[in-house]
């Protein structure tokens, strides 16, 4: 089975749907398709179904610029985000272009044919399917959907209760009245604890957040009161645009302040924790051993985690795991924490391009040896884009302008009769650091060796800066001397 499309998008999550909407709106006559491994669209927001799952960025900036998020809720729940993505796909007619249940294994470029051949397997039937396209766009994110990161905990087989990972939450898990230990201190852990603990029916008897080291945690309002008031008098579009611009500025200023005055911002963040939990709190449980934004900050709506801890329904323990026991976890300090259920909120496994192999003119494409061009295209990879969002701001801010840039690129190629566009480095700009070099999170460190390289200068640097990226992607000339164009197969030789 072989089908040809002008544009083929791998992944029907937040980035894939957004990119498809851009291309469909700009080029209504182009044939496009999305290949999605799961049986529903939504990507992360269909996969993650653990209690309390929500965005960790405000929805004004996490939503698409071209389709406003029309709610004053700041951090939305996972089901609402998935529905927003689905509604967007329906509105733009993208939902009809998705091929579900397909695991893409290889993509092979032929300079002679000027096209990609993409091979995958329909997992429900085992049928091999082949697609060809003029332009290929990967929107698969950067983590492995099959398995989250799980350290090799000693004695885990001895534990008599149930051990689960948030990435694959069991639908039948009943934690009501149970003693729960959540291992971890990142965004997933600080979301799970208040969602599972408390006095509501179905809540756990007690939840212990067991962390090796603390993370920075700060509170955001659950509801955007300013937008709520403005919405009574102004059109939704105006309210959304104001809220979006304001929040982009706040995100950027917070990040810049943490980088410029890290010790001051550290004191302010810790002061806020002490203010919410009281002066008697053991601050060693909330004082990280790194500076703000060396790792991503954890946002909690209306301080829900702090309220849960203050109520006694949950607690925090900072220690290291010696071994799992029949009844729970024995820490290196000698303390044993009893548990009926252990949740290993221990992070993600990095995976590039959804695990897809790239082959360019018969040669294996070595992604860790290449750089990204403007954070969107890949060095020496013809007619290929890779959409990756921000790690220091809302993911969608970057994926949105990347989709708009691709439309500019495709328009430039069409207007000038080009069939191929390939970024080439003629100045040896590659550095021996990964593209996320500004972030020291565990999952980034574990995945350094499989990521593309960071470049020494533009356009090979990954900036993680919305205003600068917006100018580069939306305003700067497409033809910059680094991006090489060819009008026919014989004019193009891939490196």
UniProtKB/Swiss-Prot annotation:
Q: What is the induction comment?
A: Expression is controlled by VirS. Induced at acidic pH and in macrophages.
A GO CC annotation given for this chain: peptidoglycan-based cell wall
Effect of inactivating the gene: Inactivation of the mymA operon causes altered cell wall structure, reduced contents and altered composition of mycolic acids along with the accumulation of saturated C24 and C26 fatty acids, and enhanced susceptibility to antibiotics, detergents and acidic pH. Also impairs ability to survive in macrophages.
Can you cite a GO biological process for this protein?
response to acidic pH
KW Metal-binding (keyword) present: no
Needs which cofactor?
Answer: FAD
Query: What are the EC numbers?
Result: 1.14.13.-
Question: Any binding details for the cofactor?
Answer: Binds 1 FAD per subunit.
Q: Which parts of the chain span the membrane according to its record?
A: none
Q: What keywords would UniProt list here? A: FAD, Flavoprotein, Monooxygenase, Oxidoreductase
Q: Which domain of life does the protein's organism represent? A: Bacteria
| UniProt binding sites for FAD | 15, 36, 45, 56-57, 104
Marked site, Transition state stabilizer, at: 296
Gene Ontology terms, MF aspect: flavin adenine dinucleotide binding; N,N-dimethylaniline monooxygenase activity; NADP binding
Family note = Belongs to the FAD-binding monooxygenase family.
**PANTHER family xrefs:** MONOOXYGENASE, PUTATIVE (AFU_ORTHOLOGUE AFUA_8G02570)-RELATED
> Function of this protein?
Required for maintaining the appropriate mycolic acid composition and permeability of the envelope on its exposure to acidic pH.
Recorded protein name is: Putative FAD-containing monooxygenase MymA
Q: What is the lineage of its organism?
A: Bacteria, Bacillati, Actinomycetota, Actinomycetes, Mycobacteriales
């Amino acid at each position: 089975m072989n089908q040809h499309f002008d544009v083929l998008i791998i992944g029907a999550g937040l980035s894939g749907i957004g990119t498809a909407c851009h291309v469909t709106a700009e080029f209504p006559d182009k044939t496009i398709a999305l290949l999605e491994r799961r049986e529903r669209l939504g990507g992360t927001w269909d996969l993650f179904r653990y209690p309390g799952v929500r965005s960790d960025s405000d929805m004004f900036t996490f939503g698409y610029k071209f389709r406003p998020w029309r709610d004053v809720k700041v951090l939305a729940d996972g089901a609402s985000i998935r529905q927003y993505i689905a509604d967007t796909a329906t509105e733009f007619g993208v939902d009809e272009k998705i091929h579900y249940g397909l695991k893409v294994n290889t993509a092979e470029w032929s300079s002679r044919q000027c096209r990609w051949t993409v091979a995958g397997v329909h997992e429900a039937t085992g049928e091999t399917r082949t697609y060809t396209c003029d332009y290929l766009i990967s929107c698969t994110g950067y983590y492995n959907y099959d398995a989250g990161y799980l350290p090799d905990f000693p004695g885990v087989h001895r534990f008599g209760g149930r051990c689960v990972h948030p990435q694959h939450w069991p639908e039948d898990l009943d934690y009501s009245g149970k003693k729960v230990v959540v291992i971890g201190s990142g965004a997933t852990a600080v979301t799970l604890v208040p969602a599972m603990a408390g006095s509501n029916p179905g809540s756990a008897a007690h939840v212990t957040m067991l962390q090796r080291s603390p993370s920075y945690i700060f509170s955001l309002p659950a509801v955007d009161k300013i937008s709520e008031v403005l919405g009574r008098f102004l059109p939704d579009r105006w309210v959304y645009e104001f809220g979006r611009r304001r929040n982009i500025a706040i995100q950027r200023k917070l990040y810049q302040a943490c980088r410029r005055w890290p010790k001051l911002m550290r004191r302010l963040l810790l002061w806020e924790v002490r203010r919410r939990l009281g002066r008697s709190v053991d601050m060693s449980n909330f004082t990280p051993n790194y500076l703000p934004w060396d790792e991503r900050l954890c946002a909690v709506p209306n301080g829900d985690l702090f309220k849960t801890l203050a109520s006694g329904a949950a607690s925090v323990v900072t220690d290291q795991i010696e071994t799992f026991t029949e009844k729970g976890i024995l820490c290196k300090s000698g303390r044993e924490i009893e548990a009926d259920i252990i949740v290993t909120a221990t992070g993600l496994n990095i995976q590039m391009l959804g695990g897809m192999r790239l082959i360019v003119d018969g040669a294996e494409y070595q992604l860790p040896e290449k750089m990204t061009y403007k954070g969107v295209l890949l060095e020496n990879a013809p007619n290929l884009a890779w959409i990756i969002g921000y790690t220091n701001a809302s993911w969608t801010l970057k994926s949105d302008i990347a989709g708009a840039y691709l439309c500019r690129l495709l328009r430039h190629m069409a207007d000038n009769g080009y069939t191929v566009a390939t970024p080439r480095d003629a100045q040896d700009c590659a550095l021996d650091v990964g593209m996320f070099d500004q972030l020291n999170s565990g999952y980034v460190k574990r995945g350094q060796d499989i990521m593309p390289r960071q470049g020494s200068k533009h356009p090979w640097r990954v900036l993680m800066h919305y205003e600068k990226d917006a100018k580069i992607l939306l305003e700067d000339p497409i033809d910059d001397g680094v991006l090489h164009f060819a009008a026919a197969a014989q004019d193009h030789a891939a490196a």
